[in-house]
UniProtKB/Swiss-Prot annotation:
Taxonomic lineage from the root: Bacteria, Pseudomonadati, Pseudomonadota, Betaproteobacteria, Burkholderiales
GO biological process, one term: regulation of DNA recombination
Keywords: Cytoplasm, DNA recombination
GO cellular component: bacterial nucleoid; cytoplasm
HAMAP family the UniProt entry points to: RdgC (MF_00194)
Main location per the UniProt record: cytoplasm
Domain of life: Bacteria
Cited InterPro entries: RdgC (IPR007476)
Record-given protein name: Recombination-associated protein RdgC
Cross-referenced Pfam families: RdgC (PF04381)
Keyword Cytoplasm in annotation: yes
Subcellular location(s) per record: Cytoplasm, Nucleoid
Amino acid sequence: MWFKNLKIYRLSAPWALNGDQLEECLARFAYQGGNNLEMQSLGWISPRENGLLAHTLNGQILLTLRAEKKLLPTTVVNQVAKARAQEIEEQQGYKPGRKQMKEIKERVTDELLPKAFSIYRDTRVWIDTVNHWLVIDAAASAKADEVIGLLAKTIDPLPLDNLYVEQSPAAAMTGWLAADEAPANFSIDQDTELRASGESRAAIRYVKHSIDVDDVRRHIQSGKQCTRLAMTWADRVSFVLTESLDVKRVAPLDVLKENPDAATQNDDEKFDSDMTLMTGEVAKLLAELVDSLGGEKRV
């Protein structure tokens, strides 16, 4: 249930859609399985096996975007097209021209697509209508952009803004390391990266290794800035903050994994319990993280 990598956005206006309205919007762009004539297709699927495209609980909304991509190598298309071209050459007495060859490849692609294997990738979206967050569980910006693109078509207008803070994460993290002191309710863990801003982009990394403060200060004095920093919030959630304000490798600590009711809960109850826990904890983490970066910047 827990999102691992957070791409963080702000809802720029109060959420106006009720459950039925949201479901209707999502249904227009639902994933259509079995469409064999597209190399790639996108659409919304149910986050659970209950058929609804949005799972809503106490103002928290969970969505899932499915991306399907057909595996049809160009070499295969070219081989089949070449064989077809030879047959046509024998029939008409001369080689197919460039335009005809293009048409042959298009026909071959259409014929092979229904037989091609597919790979699927699901990306989850959490909309917090109470605290006005929109969070995408994606490590890469391209995947987040894919979600935002379809979401903007699904909900028009989409009340969404990027998140801006007063102090850049790189400057803040560098300051925390130099002072050997994390902001209130946070602690610094053992993974970090410092990188030079010049052409060399020289970097020093600590990976699961105690951070030598004096060594780090020397690197900072030489012009390096912290670009990644592993931290723990409230002894409850560990994560890595990046210079681009992404939150990666999110993991609940043992204190949050203990659920005395788990043995008596059915699957639906367990899902809702996990969702309530994750959304509640991460919403508080994000609020305190933004505060530690000087607060939200209005642009």
